[in-house]
Each structure stands twice: as C-alpha cells, then as structure tokens.
Amino acid sequence: MLDTVAPSPDIDALMNDIGRKAKAAARPLGFASTEAKNKALNAMADAIMANKAHILAENAKDLKDIEGSETLASFVDRLTLNDKRIAEMAEGIRAIAALADPVGEVIAAWDRPNGLKIERVRTPLGVIGVIFESRPNVTADAGALCLKAGNAVILRCGSDSRRSSQAIHVCMVEGLKAAGLPEHAIQLVPVTDRAAVGAMLRGLEGAIDVIVPRGGKSLVARVQNEARVPVFAHLEGLCHIYVDASADLEMAKKIVVNAKMRRTGICGAAETLLVDGAAIDTHLTPLLEVLTDAGCEIRASAAVLKVAPGLKTATEEDWSTEYLDAIISVATVDGISGAIAHIQTYSSNHTEAVIAEDPAVVQRFFTEVDSAILLHNASTQFADGGEFGMGAEIGIATGKMHARGPVGVEQLTSFKYRVRGAGQTRP
C-alpha cells in the first residue's frame, strides 16, 4: 500500500466521477428521514443474510488467492468470513438502525441577555472516504455508520478482500434502493490500482470531507503523511495492561489471557504486560504460567528473567512492537508511577488497562495516562465501538481533534448553530 504510483488520467477521471456522485448523494442524505435510513439499514441486513452463501463463496476465492503466500495468520483471520461473522455483520447493521439518529440533535442550547436563543445542532460531515485492507466487514460497518449519520461514503478495499467486499457492497446498495435513498450514497471503488488511493487522499476535487484508514501501519502512515483532508486514524494499537499489587490474582489471570489471546490480530489486543514490582512473589509467576499455557510466547525484561530464566529476552524494539500475534512483552515496574512512565514512553495512545483494587491507583491511572481508551479491571479487547454500544465503529482514532476512541455514529457528525431572534440588531 505504500507504493507511490503516478496518477493515471483514467483513474483520476474515474475517481473524480465517484467523488461527484458521492457529493450529489450526500445532500439529500443529509436531511433524509430517520425512518428511511433505518429502512435501508434493515434491508441491508436482510440482503446480507439472504446472500450469505454467495458472500462466503466470494470470500473463499479471496482466501484461495493468498494460499501459499507468506501471509500472517492475523491477516488471514481478518480476511476470513464464516456463518457467525456474517450473522454478526448483519446484526451490527441492525444495531446501528436501532441507535438514535444523531442528525438534528440539539447538543446545547442557551439564551443570551439580548433575547437571542442559540442552539448547537448535529449535522452530517458530508462525504467520508474509507480506505481499508483485509477486513471485508468494513464494507458493511462503514457503510451503515456513515448512512446513519447522514453521510455518503466512498470505500476502497484492498485487493485481498476485493471479491468479498463487492459481494457485501451489492447488499448495501440493495438496501439503499429499497428505501428510496441515492444508490451512490455507498460506493465501492471498482479498481485495485493504487493510484485510486492517491486520488482519494487528494480529496477528489473537494468531494471528500474526511478520510478514515483501516489497515496496517504502512497504510495508515501513508494516509497520515499524504492526505490533504482531515484524517481519523490510529497508527497502531500498542496496548498495555498494568497489574497492580492490589489486583485480584484470579481476575488478573483471566483478563490478561483474554486481552492477549482472544483475538491476537486486532488493534485492541494487549502487547505489553506490566507487573507491579511489589507483586513479583504473588502475581508474576501465575501470570506467566497462564500465558504460556494459552500458547503465548513471552519476551521478558531482565527482572522477569530472574524469576523465569527460560523465557526469551525482550529487546528495546519489543517494547514498541505491535505483534498482532501470540507474543507479549512482560516487564516489572515500580508501582503505578513506573507503569505510567513506561506507558508514556512506548504507548501509541490507543488502549491501556489497569487491574487493581486500590482506588487511588485506579484514579492515578485514569488521570495521568493519556490514551484514547482506559479500562479498569476489564480486557483491552473491549476497545470496540460495538462493545461501547455504538452498534459498530468505523475505526479507532487516537488523535485529539474532533474524534477520539471508537468512531461511531456521533463522531461522524459535525454541528452548526441555529440562532433565533426577534428583531435584534447589534449595537
């Protein structure tokens, strides 16, 4: 995805046409009724379930294309669809339909001494560009979220998920048509030429309002470096768990294994475990044992190696590595102060968790750690819009402008001010 490709006149013309169609669709979509949007979403979910066999067949072709390649297991996992994941995809769309419509919501209202009545009201962003790699479910999640928020969306999938994404996209368009909404409200770029990505990053002649990348570090870095429009993104999910001396050991064991091993290839998977130095005798060995029993490779600091000398030594690079695999770095730290210092040094500001029963420790963690998502006594794998009750997410944002954390329906809106007067003039 990082390759720099000279723009092709044909690709530029194609992409600019897609941009014009998206912008034209965004206007009526911005004031479409909640009923129409929900009708479209439920029809999309129905179409996905009705076409499950076709989607799975197309996904099998995508998977066959990468057979024999040196592809990471985490990549294959993200690309793979099955009955359960398709059902979850459809259910996610229905959950988005069930959410309150953010468009037109009055966020704040106040009266001025001169009698002016001011309201801040949610509005759609306009046209969202979503560039993603191996996750075909993004076609459904992003399309549904953007629609609910009154936005048009241009989806550019990776070549690896092309067939799967196309099969899902057909279902999304079917839902739009069923509700009488513009079919160009959700478009999938029909070519795999990387010049299409460059065209989107340039904004398609002003059509795109925001870009959201979903993929590996190289893709996100390219988008952040080259985009001429605002970007909602995270570069990587370097997530930490700190186990305090006050932590309930059985709870800590359960959470640590889940945070690392439930799905190792997602951005909310834990990559570093920090154990309070005061808990070396009570917590460290049991935590190492449950991770090893779960099939996780441990890369250990010098202090950890003194307790478990058979482990692999962690290098400096390990502390800043997003493994996306069954590997975790483990270190001991000097209490909550040491944990915060380590996280500040190596974190990607995505998600961090503290396991502790001491409320003072939890309060310091929540106050001083500056990541988008902080958890207490819960797995980092809850870093997900669906788990937050957002129905789904278009991604996780770690920046501090506009959207941070899971980017759901509300985060895909802007706002405007409505000011009502009764003939006031400014003195």
Swiss-Prot record:
Pathway: Amino-acid biosynthesis; L-proline biosynthesis; L-glutamate 5-semialdehyde from L-glutamate: step 2/2. InterPro entries: Ald_DH/histidinol_DH, Ald_DH_C, Ald_DH_N, Aldehyde_DH_dom, G-glutamylP_reductase_CS, Glu-5-SA_DH, GPR_dom. The lineage of its organism: Bacteria, Pseudomonadati, Pseudomonadota, Alphaproteobacteria, Hyphomicrobiales. GO terms for biological process: L-proline biosynthetic process. Catalyzes the NADPH-dependent reduction of L-glutamate 5-phosphate into L-glutamate 5-semialdehyde and phosphate. The product spontaneously undergoes cyclization to form 1-pyrroline-5-carboxylate. PANTHER family: DELTA-1-PYRROLINE-5-CARBOXYLATE SYNTHASE, GLUTAMATE SEMIALDEHYDE DEHYDROGENASE. Its main location: cytoplasm. It comes from Rhizobium etli (strain ATCC 51251 / DSM 11541 / JCM 21823 / NBRC 15573 / CFN 42). It comes from the Bacteria. Keywords: Amino-acid biosynthesis, Cytoplasm, NADP, Oxidoreductase, Proline biosynthesis. This is Gamma-glutamyl phosphate reductase. It is found in: Cytoplasm.
